[in-house]
Amino acid sequence: MENDHYGDELTLRLSGIADITALDDDLALTTFMRDLVTRIGMTVIAGPMVATEGGPPEKSGKSAVVILAESHAAIHTYPHLREIFVNVFSCKPFREADVLAEFRRLVGDFRISEHLLRRRGEEWPRDLAAAEQLWSGHRTALSSVHD
């Protein structure tokens, strides 16, 4: 039975943003999210949606999300702090370099102050027969625990 992982999840904190203009602009963020998911080859189900986070300057900014057939992409911007938090999760492979290139196009230079690329769903079966075999084994094991 051939197993793999379900997909990759990229989580970033981008700091020292050179140009913060787009970080507080609904239209710019909507366009950016559309361009980002197009570049990494994903299929939009809903969005992009952009919401404003109010409050003191260190907590105010925008959140943008797009729901994908492959999962999701989300960002949270903090213009006053010159920071962006990024999360891209997909069952379809994507290139991290493409994600970073889109951010450079949006804001110019930045520093990656936090970076995590995780393989999610280890031992995820890639075909139906493998999935049935995997899950029937789990059901058998669970049945014996409850008997």
Question: Residue spans of the language-model regions?
Answer:
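Polybasic/polar functional segments that serve as interface/processing modules
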Residues: M1-D147
